[in-house]
Each structure stands twice: as C-alpha cells, then as structure tokens.
Amino acid sequence: MKYPRAWLSGLLAAFLVTTVWGDSTPAAQPAGAGLAGAWRARMHFDSGAFAGVKDLEFMYVYNVGGTLTESSNYDAAPPVPPAYGIWRPAGANHYQSKYVFYVTKAPASFQDITKGGGWSPDGSGVFTEEITLAADGNSYTAKVAYLAYDVNGKPAAGSGAGTATGVRIRF
C-alpha cells in the first residue's frame, strides 16, 4: 500500500505539534510525596556555633528511599563537603532527619598548602530535625539541634539549637 507524500507529511506535522505543544509542564508534586524532593531552607540558631550566622541557608534532596543530601551556602567557608543522612516519617505530616558533615581545620600557613597539606579533618557535626510539613506539602517548619564533635568523636564546643523554614523547589 502506497501512502501519498502529503499524507505522511501531515501525519509527521501533527505528531510534532502534539509533542512540542502538548502539556510539557512538569508534573506537580504527586499527592502523598511527603518530604521526598528538593528543598531550600533558612536556619536560625538561638545558641551554639551557628547563632551568629544570620543568613544560613541549606539545600536538601530528600530521596524516596529515606536518604538525604544537604549543602549550605557556607560549604566553602571553610571548605567542607556536603552532609549526608537519613530521614523518616514520624506521623501525619511529621518527619525526622539526621545528617552528618565533616569539619575542616584551616592550615596554619600558606606554606602548609604548598607542601601538600591543606584543610585537614577537625571533627564532625550532626544535625537532627523535627519537621512539620504544611498541608499543601510545599513548605515546612522544623526544630533543629546541632551537635559538634572533635576529631576523636568526642563532644566539642559549639552545639546548639534553632529553627528552620523550608520551601519545596519547583518549576
């Protein structure tokens, strides 16, 4: 069976139009997704090492499997890697999270860097959050605790408590 060229061209054009101009808007966050997804949060500490930081922001990815990755707007001061952790449901619209990051120590001098040294390990920090998700699933509030540990894993100065507000990152 032979198809006229005009008919094939029309079919191809119709396909392209529906593909390009169809509903290309990203799907809304599915109902019941809970905390899973990408978030931007502001933290305010009342005590501890972070109490003096007034513009602390965190970016999170809460993975469906219960893991999370966090990075802050201060990860480069001093250089520290992102934090990694876990999260879980704790009731209707309530969640708990716990994540850990490494603390680094500044080199004593520039010569330490040129000799192959650099920012050496100087401990770790653990954040825990008690999160309450808004009814629409697009924002949250949280109570935050920070525990500081020295390089040997013993409690160190700087632990504190505060609050956070977060918003889901969306198109």
Q: Model-predicted segments: where are they?
A:
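N-terminal glycine/threonine-rich, aromatic-flanked beta-hairpin/loop signature
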Residues: 51-94, 101-105, 137-142, 146
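Edge beta-strand at a domain terminus
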Residues: 146-171
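Tryptophan-anchored aromatic micro-motifs
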Residues: 32-51, 85
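Boundary at the C-terminal end of the N-terminal hydrophobic targeting segment
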Residues: 22, 26-30
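Acidic, glycine-rich flexible loop segments
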Residues: 103-137
